[in-house]
Amino acid sequence: ELWRHVGPDMDVPAGDIGVGGREVGYMFGMYKKLTHEFTGTFTGKGLEFGGSLIRPEATGFGGLYFVKHMLDKKGIDIKGKTVAISGFGNVAWGAATKATQLGAKVVTISGPDGYIYDPDGISGEKIDYMLELRASGNDIVAPYADKFPGSTFVEGRRPWEVKVDIALPCATQNELNGEDAMNLINNSVLCVGEISNMGCTPEAIDAFIEHKLMYAPGKAVNAGGVATSGLEMSQNAMHLSWTAQEVDEKLHQIMHNIHEQCVKYGTEPDGYINYVKGANIAGFMKVAHAMMAQGIVLSLIHISEPTRLGMIS
């Protein structure tokens, strides 16, 4: 029954927690049998049948591009900065890979069992080992400390107690709470980028904004995954296969554009960039303009007070 409700111009399923290339492949295969069509209806497919390079790591890559733009806006170089990452799946792996490429030092990853602190930096074969940990199916990170001397496994705790310059939730929802936020603030964190979906609790977000911290929500920071799904669909529609460099460059430009929109709508009179406000207003304005351009009449719709937008008539 599902196949009637999905399509390249209708609804496009993709991977997430618990849904990877294998599951997407099974669904795409059945969809083809039912429709007798090869279209970009599913994304995150295998490279052998219409998938895109960079797609598995795209969410992490895009998140780092966004964070770099946040720092650049304040004249801060990401090179040499320490980074705390949670999780050890595709998103965390992509984030660690791109952070290292940009010259930052990743010092933590985490799992349900606790977190790893590696002051020497998680790069090279250590990043590759993250994939081995995930493939093992054990859902633990403790073996990392056994394999790489000098690193420490901290059982049952989250990585936000480590003093770092940049914090990147990459695991799951509500993984960074108000107490964690205050730990980061007290440790003088520069920037928090929410790469996981709803990774920060409302209390944490309020604390970041109250302290005028550079914080950006997942709806902006983790858009790289959805953006690259769109790039995969474009390749399918044109029957092309772009190189990894081509996809990466397009992804970088998309994240740059998203950041610019957040800055446009989120900059406050005192110069603080409220990325939550900016992302919300930018998203709303895009949808509202499209609706009005297509003939939808919006009459005296009052926007919620926190957006300070007034009304559209």
Predicted regions and their residues:
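Flexible, glycine/charged-enriched surface loops at secondary-structure junctions
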Residues: 6-15, 38-40, 74-82, 262-278, ...
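General beta-strand structural signal in soluble alpha/beta enzymes
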Residues: 10-15, 37-42, 85, 108-111, ...
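A glycine-rich phosphate-binding loop feature that marks nucleotide/adenosyl-phosphate handling sites
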Residues: 14-24, 44-46, 80-90, 113, ...
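Glycine-rich phosphate/diphosphate-binding loop of Rossmann-like nucleotide-binding domains
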Residues: 54-57, 61-158
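Single conserved hydrophobic/aromatic residue that forms the stacking wall/gate
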Residues: 301-313
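Rossmann-like adenosine-cofactor binding region
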Residues: 114-215, 220
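Adenosine-phosphate binding glycine-rich loop
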Residues: 185-299
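N-terminal ligand-binding/catalytic initiation module
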Residues: 1-53, 286-298
